[in-house]
């Protein structure tokens, strides 16, 4: 598939957008006694995905009247497209309390967001060597990625939000009697844009088609193909992530528009549109 928290590494990854002079830097001394002034609009930035977990943190903020009025600390998973991290936590699937934490991830994220709105400057969230903070009561998770993403977002300036509602979206086709696979599509939307894509499938045994191929069980190269199925579908995912639309397709659902792709891909683009019906 293409496109942090309690198990991030101590060393924070670099943020994606950070000019040398920033509004955030200009207000780095603000701890709430002064009002930070930012241009009104929507602010969004990410940091690099965590290599172990696949979670890619982002900060999404709204500035009104020169002040941060809304803050969203969230993440999407580059290895397993679908629900955003808050939703995973809200559904009880992230399991911090089960692991001994005092509260779930989304509850701690909400406290960090409220602190940022109060202080108006991500630099007010002081960090220790492990990327944690003592500045926010009830927050034990690593907050480095949130701070870095928020700083990068404020540095980059307002951005235009995309057309879709944020969240995870899923669609699946019918079981193919000949192949024994049913196509599946999972998309993640953040700041209104598609940020993660997974084109895969499932068989009667519940196997994930991409993983089935990664494990060497699908056997396309053994059958004479130039690449394995998961390698080809990754190129299709990248195309969709960049273009947001289907390429020109043959009557068989194949395409010459994506180099190195010989598999049938038409159904995935149809299912992607179906999945996004819930995002409009």
Language-model-detected regions and their locations in the chain:
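Active-site rim loops that border cofactor/substrate pockets in soluble metabolic enzymes
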Residues: 171
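Active-site- and interface-proximal helix/loop "cap" or "latch" segments in soluble metabolic
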Residues: 32-40, 44-164, 175-280
